[in-house]
Amino acid sequence: MSESMFSRRDFLLGGTALAGTLLLDSFGDWRRRAEAAEGEVNLYSGRHYNTDNQIYREFTQKTGIKVNLIEGEADALLARLKSEGSRSPADVFITVDAGRLWQATQANLLRPLTQAQAPKLYQAVPANLRDPQGRWFALSKRARVIMYNRDRVNASQLSTYEDLANPKWRNQILVRSSSNVYNLSLTGEMIAADGAAKTEAWARGLVQNFARQPQGGDTPQILACAAGVGSLAIANTYYLVRLFKSKKAEEREAARKIKVFFPNQKGRGTHVNISGAGIVRTAPNPRAAQLLLEYLLSSQAQAVFARGNGEYPVLRGVSLDPILAGFGQFKESKISASVFGANNAQALQLMDRAGWK
């Protein structure tokens, strides 16, 4: 596999100065815990956010453990791990979407951790946001919501994901393709909640309500909704946060035309997907790898995830990005993220039969 598909970076002690909010806790505690760990950790990451790099530098500063980062697309990183096999230098695999983490477990790429082996990880992450065998743990959350054009829709008209198949929304719904992992995971959760037959019927109704054939990512759906191409968009909340912060005045103006609705609040709650990480089964530096995961779930790192990319933190008590907080509080679905991937294949098949391209 071509090395040009990946980006390599190292984070050394004494790197770029960091925001003061990250330096509030004791260096000594992390130093003591690092004494039994190896001196470096090799990280394969499918996340591409500068704020993550800030966290890695801070980890190195606090522990003395060097982080060697390889960035790439998640599917390419999974293929690389499979190709490298027991020779892989990777210690930690990080990616967005629970479905991709499930793929890693199916390929036997990740090491299981018991609660006795990793009490801090089990304490930090709720059961529905981690693998039942401790092979991966959520690092951040992203809610997939209904966004609506405030000039065309009243919130009282909205209720559930299931209601999006109602004919009253004919030619009004904007959403990306069925092959997108976020839509696959949403549909996978609906299979778990409603059953495959009802979910397929829902998908058929949803397709009938498309404002246009799916095209582009979440941001184009939101912008099209603001422009009146449709009235509703299915998208992750952090994409709207980015538009509010855009350097382009027209994108900020578009964001102001959009409101967020959290579906299924009287039922199971709103679908929440994750970014997550696990220790590679053949990790040459397993103690350093576990310490990195524990740091990523510390209050300091969680605050950076929340503020830097507009994601929801996994750890309780961590402040949200002010724009994200402005969308309001909501009830989250407690359906295990592990089923999103388990239902991926079935989800794609029924979406295809429904005509969701």
UniProtKB/Swiss-Prot annotation:
Predominant cellular place of this UniProt entry's protein: membrane
Entry comment on modification after translation: Predicted to be exported by the Tat system. The position of the signal peptide cleavage has not been experimentally proven.
One Pfam family per UniProt: SBP_bac_6
Annotated Gene Ontology cellular component terms: outer membrane-bounded periplasmic space; plasma membrane-derived thylakoid membrane
Location relative to the cell: Cellular thylakoid membrane
Known role: Plays an important role in protecting the acceptor side of photosystem II (PSII) against oxidative damage, especially under iron-limiting growth conditions.
Alphabetized InterPro entries for the sequence: Ferric-bd (IPR026045), TAT_signal (IPR006311)
Lineage: Bacteria, Bacillati, Cyanobacteriota, Cyanophyceae, Synechococcales
Signal peptide residues on this chain, from the entry's feature table: 1-36
Membrane topology, record value: Peripheral membrane protein
GO molecular function annotation: metal ion binding
Protein's name according to its UniProt entry: Iron deficiency-induced protein A
Upregulating conditions: By iron limitation and to a smaller extent by manganese limitation. Regulated by IdiB. May also be indirectly regulated by DpsA and Fur.
Residues that hold Fe cation according to the record: H48, Y49, Y182, Y238, Y239
UniProt keywords, alphabetically: Ion transport, Iron, Iron transport, Membrane, Metal-binding, Signal, Thylakoid, Transport
Protein family per UniProt: Belongs to the bacterial solute-binding protein 1 family.
Gene: idiA
Organism: Synechococcus elongatus (strain ATCC 33912 / PCC 7942 / FACHB-805)
Gene3D superfamilies membership: Periplasmic binding protein-like II
